[in-house]
Structure formats: C-alpha cells, structure tokens
Amino acid sequence: MTELFIDGAWRDGAGPVFASRNPGTGEPVWEGAGASADDVERAVASARRAFAAWSALDLDARCAIVKRFAALLVERKEALATMIGRETGKPLWEARTEVASMAAKVDVSIAAYHERTGERRSPTADGVAVLRHRPHGVVAVFGPYNFPGHLPNGHIVPALIAGNTVVFKPSELAPGVARATVEIWRDAGLPAGVLNLVQGEKDTGVALANHRQIDGLFFTGSSDTGTLLHRQFGGRPEIVLALEMGGNNPLVVADVEDIDAAVHHAIQSAFLSAGQRCTCARRILVPRGAFGDRFLERFADVASRITADVYDADPQPFMGAVISARAASRLVAAQAKLLELGAAPIIEMRQRDPALGFVNASILDVTPVRELPDEEHFGPLAQIVRYTDLDDAIARANDTAFGLSAGLLADDETVWNTFRRAIRAGIVNWNRPTNGASSAAPFGGAGRSGNHRPSAYYAADYCAYPMASVESAQLQMPANLSPGLHF
C-alpha cells in the first residue's frame, strides 16, 4: 500500500509493515509499510527543494490554498470524522467536533500571523524601520494520537502560512487519519514537496528528528519523549524546537452553591475524551467536611453512570475506548500501584475486555498516600485529594513539576483572584472545565509541560523569525559626519 506522500506523490515505504486497529472492536483500520531512513531523507530533500518557491509565493496565495483546505474539511467532515472515530475509538460526536476545530484553525491562524508576525513600518529620522518575519525553512511536525487531526494541524497550518515546508510524522496509532488529512491538502492544491508524510514507528521518528537538514521540530506528545528531544537538540541553537507536553493538572473545588454544576465540570475535566486530553484534570482537590463529602458522593454517582461504547454507537456514548488495549492495561496497572501506596477506591477501574481499550471512569481517594507520584495517567483515572483551606489547596495543586492546566470551581471572585495569582500553569480556568481552551489564546504550560513555546494563537511566533530593517530609498551622505571622518 502506498502510504508515504513525498514530493507530491504517494509512494511505497521501505520500512517495516505496521497497522492500526479500532480500539473498541479490534478490527483493522490501516496497514502499510513505514518510512525507512532513506524515505525520510527523500522527504526532507523534497521539502528543501520546495521551500524557495513556497516561501517566495505571495502570502495571499499561500492563504488561498490553506482556505481551500478548510473548505474541503467542511465538505468531507463526515468521512474524516469516521476515520478518526474508527482509529482512535472516540465517539462520532467528538470526532466531528475535532474536524470542525481543524477547519476553524485556518482563519484563526491567518489572523494570528498578521497580528503577531506580520509586517510593521515606522518612520525614522533617516528613513523607515521595517519589521518583517521570515520562515525557518523545513520543519518536522510530530503528531499525537489523541487528536490526530487537530493537534498536528495546529502546527502545520501556521507553518505553511508563514512559508515553511513540512515533513509530517504522525502517531503510529493513527496513520489513517494522517493519510486522509494529507489527501485533503493535496486536493486543496498544495504544491509538490510543501507537505510530506512519513508514516512509521519509533525508527522513523528517530530518523526524522536526527536529520541535519531540518530547521525546526514541532512536537505534541508525552513529557518523557519531549524531554528526550530537548536533550537531543541541546547545543543546537539554530533549531527551533516547540514542545507541547502533558500535565498532572489540578482542579480545585470550593464550597459552591450549585453542586451539580461543579460535578458536571469535574466530570468533563476528568473524563472527557476518556481522559485522553493533555489538559484533563488528573487531581481533583475537594474540601474536607460536609460539602466535600456531598460533592464526592454526587461525583461518584454521576461517574458510575458514564456510558462507554464503540465510536458509532446509537445512542452516542460519553466515552469511547482509550487508544489501545495496552493503554487500558497500563491504566489498570497505574491504579493498582496507587492502591498499593494507600489510595482508597471510590470507583475502581476495570478493563472490559483484555483485547480492547474499554475502561470505566474511575475515582481514587489518594489523600492517604504519603508520597503521591507526580505522574500523568493518560486516561479516565481521577485522583481525589482532600484539603483544609485555600492555602492548602493551592499548595497541593502546585505540588507538581508540570504546569499545563488548572481550574477552580468557586462562587467567590476573591477566591478566584487569589487562586489565579498563586497557581503555576499556562491555562487557568474559573468555573469552566480544565480542558476548555480558546483557539484565540495561546496554548501551553510551565514546568515540564513545555519549553515556553505555546501553540494555538501563539504558534505564529515559532513558525517565523523577525527580520528588522532600517531602509532608505535614496543613498545619500549624512548631513553631519562622525568625528574623525573627512570627505
């Protein structure tokens, strides 16, 4: 099967054969040969050849192609959503939302380019000062499996608008979504070599990351892999590296009047996308006392009735399967470790079928655990931490090396103002789920959640570098010479 897209054509890979499966049914979705090191070499060379013409193309012409891509996404929304659902297990309602987000990203990215990296002119005494922005060159984009369309799209779209060319290495767990997306780019009229697709597993990613002819690498994925990339590019300041990684995110619940609203936002924060969003709440901090007890009782009641089913089930479930049976078993193992450390089960996670990715939403009270591991468990595993007062809640919330998202559910704005000033995270929400983020704002975190290159609206910043010029249309001698010069 021809599954690599290099220099505007579909090609056979020379690497190992691998496959993706629907985690909710086990059925095969995609199979093909990955890219070998030689295939990666050809992809990078193709992007390098295409760079001069693409970057020289008028910005409006580049944007016209990108807008055509958005229009085709709308036309093919159902087909792409179905592929996302089949390959990731997420319900169709959520897959459709992902495709809609991909299309909406285009106008937002164009606006961000003009606002953050456009051209500025200001008069000076001797001419005009001009600020322009230039593309880096060839950039590698590494995509994750949880949003296999939307998240790499958040790097690719602004990179292309800025004039870069791209080599895209998707997750080996979602190659079918990547192929379908690249087909849409091809049909939108993107010139040959501007976007290249190299499918593959770890060896393909290593070959691309190690290539000496890339000018940048944009990564979304785990903190462990991102940290390895950061070490790898140490001593290479010429490479622009943008890392979007995970978090051990806290949601603090205060004593609120509308307990059902608090429970709803906690459910969304912890269990949306089966807990497979990097902004999901991993720790839910609940006050000690009667209110906290009532909240936990209601939270457990609603969580116990969350439906999980195949992507196209009717009626639609809230959750689908996690990405694989292996991921499901790792979550159950993580729960077992926490129980061994002294956590008290409120709802225990169980894997429905060892061959599939279905697990239920689970809740553990980890307050008794003396040394709680600072880890991101990428699934529907909510850890409850009881606190005494706001200072205690903030201290516990900040007790992490990560800093992606955090949230507060509270009626009192004074409490919110105290919280937002003290919390250490890049996305901090009040009376909204932790995984709610605006595309018109930056998306990124502090600590081990990234390397201070936020994406979304600020992706324009790492897709181009500033070029400052002082210009005069006429060459002439200055009115006054510097001391010691004689003409």
Curated annotation (Swiss-Prot):
Binding annotation for NAD(+): 221-226
Pathway(s) this gene product operates in, as recorded in its UniProt entry: Amino-acid degradation; L-arginine degradation via AST pathway; L-glutamate and succinate from L-arginine: step 4/5
Entry's EC annotation: 1.2.1.71
Protein name as catalogued: N-succinylglutamate 5-semialdehyde dehydrogenase
Origin: domain of life: Bacteria
Active site: 244, 278
InterPro entries: Ald_DH/histidinol_DH, Ald_DH_C, Ald_DH_CS_CYS, Ald_DH_CS_GLU, Ald_DH_N, Aldehyde_DH_dom, SuccinylGlu_semiald_DH_AstD
Primary gene name: astD
Similarity comment text for this entry: Belongs to the aldehyde dehydrogenase family. AstD subfamily.
Source organism of this protein record: Burkholderia pseudomallei (strain K96243)
Keyword field contains rRNA-binding: no
One GO biological process term: arginine catabolic process to glutamate
First-level EC class: oxidoreductase
Pfam families hit by this protein: Aldedh
GO MF annotation terms: succinylglutamate-semialdehyde dehydrogenase activity
Record keywords, A-Z: Arginine metabolism, NAD, Oxidoreductase
Catalyzed reactions per annotation: N-succinyl-L-glutamate 5-semialdehyde + NAD(+) + H2O = N-succinyl-L-glutamate + NADH + 2 H(+)
Record carries keyword Transit peptide: no
Function: Catalyzes the NAD-dependent reduction of succinylglutamate semialdehyde into succinylglutamate.
